[in-house]
Amino acid sequence: MVTAYDATFASIVDAGGVDMILVGDSVATVLQGQRNTLGVSMEQMEYHVQMVAAAKPFALIIGDMPFGSYQASVTDAVTNAVRLIKAGAEIVKLEGGVHVSEQIAAISSIDVPVMGHIGLTPQSYHRMGGNKIQGRTEGKEAGSRERLIEDALAVQEAGACAVVIEGVPSDLATEITGSLDIPSIGIGAGVGCDGQVLVMHDLLGLSPRTFTFAKPFADLRNRATTAIAQYVAEVRSGEWPDAEHSFS
């Protein structure tokens, strides 16, 4: 699974052979320049889902439910899940474990597939004190190993079709995956998950900084900068447009 936020990149990602395209609320940090994902709205998520759907990809389209769109009530969760499906998503994704199991069950009950998301959940940015690795402590408190296993099982029991496991030790992600009947998709969770997801801009080397877990498979940021600098130089020198790129 790889993220995309518009038709152009959705078609590129799809041509690369991914199984799923995530229209993530990471659009807030990747495209909008925000510090975290909390500010993105339902309207913005609908807009980006519509753009990705316009590419008519073979890959499944996963629509992220943004912060505030499902936490307050089951009614909100169902209503906003339907909005994303109508915009073109085929699965909706929401963050949390035990405390959102009722929302997952309600959305699933109207035949909308739900993908869960446990571990480091970016919408819990303030409670976690930032984006910090989870599952390194024992006990029943939020973020502990035992709690994350409980969260994963609760998400499955509520009817989720898959679950993202983010930012946890690889041995814990492997243990959680082994306890589930539904697929797990890891990000910063090691090789033991059933699948993997990366933000497209990290994968392509477009991001200004690289996270430890995110391997850049290309260096498009520097290549793009070099190309633009060459364009600027040729325009300023009068070298371009040349006869080949002009009409007679």
PLM segments and residue spans:
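Alpha/beta enzyme core
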Residues: M1-A218, N222-S248
